[in-house]
Amino acid sequence: MSLNKIYKNQNYFDKFEPKSMVPNINIYWKKAKDFYVWDKKNKKYVDFTSTIFVSNIGHSNPKLIKKIGDVLKNPISHSYIYYNKYRQEYVSKLIKFVNKKNLNKCFFMSSGTESTEAALKLIRLNGLKKNKEKKGIICLSGNWHGRTMGAQLLSDNQDQSKWITNKDKNIYHIDFPYPWIK
């Protein structure tokens, strides 16, 4: 199927992907560079999505492309669960960059989903460590944390979390204080 046909057929994504994965930005990206994206008519946009994969590093970052290329040329597994020189270099640079006495460990993850689930676990463990009764988690309305069960429990999107039948009674949602709205 040609890209033009896919672009014209807005139902394409609905047909082949679940509702939660259908693109919510109605721009079919043709190319991207730095913090810009272009559609099929070469209209240029600033990419304010800050979403998965590029996460504020931009598209086609030459330094990143070179570094990834260098790593991929080495025929070893590049999982974050194995020791290797790239991991050691990265940890050293990251800790030096953060430069905080009490922030001297790294916890590698491969996605925002994994990070959200780990944060949920750490929040709960920290509360229980301080006091066995500290089970509650307060979340602000309008948040979006992902598509996993834990993430959707933290989010207050009722439409996307209605499938969850055993909601956590210790997760509370409060309105975000929008000071500009009266």
Annotate each predicted stretch with a short phrase.
Residues 38-39, 57-58, 151-156:
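Short beta-strand-to-turn element immediately C-terminal to the catalytic PLP-Schiff-base lysine
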Residues 92-182:
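PLP-dependent aspartate aminotransferase-fold enzymes
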